[in-house]
């Protein structure tokens, strides 16, 4: 994902495993919350998050089981948001995610650009001019 951000290419995370699917965020580089923003926010809320994410990232592709129906539902939800974006319509997964829970209910979460994330530093509009200290 770092390469997509560096190339200023919008992208969206889609995942489904162990009964829960997630669509989003739809990342507009330097304009919306990125995946690293989400990790930093989760770390702020839960100091154990880095250990959790290290465990989740240790599975080879295809190793974690996913229900076929859940996978289809997540794919349909992701397609809906991707097509809306391509048609020029705003998407609720920009600065947000939708979790599809085991009971098929949807849970929407909003995310903000994290102040410690490097993603916003790539946006020249976010740079602030700092006046040099002067001696009086």
PLM feature segments, named:
Residues 1-136:
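Glycine-rich phosphate/adenylate-binding loop
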């Amino acid at each position: 994902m770092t390469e997509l951000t560096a190339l200023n290419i919008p992208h969206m995370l889609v995942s489904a495993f162990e009964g829960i699917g997630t669509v989003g965020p739809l990342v507009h580089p330097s304009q919306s919350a990125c995946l690293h923003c989400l990790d930093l926010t989760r770390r702020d809320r839960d100091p154990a998050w880095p250990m959790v994410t290290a465990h989740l990232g240790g599975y080879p592709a295809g190793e974690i089981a996913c229900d076929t129906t859940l996978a289809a539902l997540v794919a349909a939800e992701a397609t809906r948001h991707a097509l809306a974006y391509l048609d020029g319509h705003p998407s609720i997964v920009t600065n947000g995610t939708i979790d599809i829970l085991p009971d098929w209910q949807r849970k929407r979460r909003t995310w903000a650009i994290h102040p410690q994330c490097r993603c916003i530093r790539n946006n020249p509009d976010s740079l602030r001019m700092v006046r040099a200290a002067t001696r009086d």
